[in-house]
Amino acid sequence: MAKITKEQFIESLKEMTIKEVMEFVDALKEEFGVDPSAVAVAATPVATEEVKTEVKLTLKAAGQQKVAVIKVVKDLLGLSLMDAKKLVDAAPSVLKEAIKPEEAEEYKAKLVAAGAEVSID
């Protein structure tokens, strides 16, 4: 039997009618015992990543510039200076819960700029 190239095979497929292609696919399934739906299922991702609509902002550590971090926490959360200091001293501590991811990123940027270590969960 003569071996044909991939290009020749594709050209042959182009010349076939839809019915002939369907018959060809059925013959391949039967000959090789292949079920194309099993391959399609395997190729589909099992789980998609869930987009969070609310996150939690946590202060992990104040870093070297504790006073600057206290001021930022005070301004962001509207706390008194003493309450902000207590919150920073108690790190790791939750600064805000159930906030929008965009807002959390904004807060994180300000805190990191002041020298804090922050996480968004």
Curated annotation (Swiss-Prot):
Against NCBIfam families, the record matches this protein to: L12 (TIGR00855)
Q: Which Gene3D superfamilies match?
A: 3.30.1390.10, Single helix bin
Which named protein is this? Large ribosomal subunit protein bL12
Q: What is a single Pfam family found in this protein's UniProt entry?
A: Ribosomal_L12
Family as reported in the entry's similarity comment: Belongs to the bacterial ribosomal protein bL12 family.
Task: Alphabetically list the UniProt keywords.
Answer: Ribonucleoprotein, Ribosomal protein
What GO CC annotations are associated with the protein? cytosolic large ribosomal subunit
Name one process (GO BP) from the record. Answer: translation
The GO terms this record gives for MF are:
mRNA binding; structural constituent of ribosome
State whether keyword S-adenosyl-L-methionine applies: no
The record's section on InterPro entries has: Ribosomal_bL12 (IPR000206), Ribosomal_bL12_C (IPR013823), Ribosomal_bL12_C/ClpS-like (IPR014719), Ribosomal_bL12_oligo (IPR008932), Ribosomal_bL12_oligo_N_sf (IPR036235)
| Known partners and oligomeric status | Homodimer. Part of the ribosomal stalk of the 50S ribosomal subunit. Forms a multimeric L10(L12)X complex, where L10 forms an elongated spine to which 2 to 4 L12 dimers bind in a sequential fashion. Binds GTP-bound translation factors.
Q: What does this protein do?
A: Forms part of the ribosomal stalk which helps the ribosome interact with GTP-bound translation factors. Is thus essential for accurate translation.
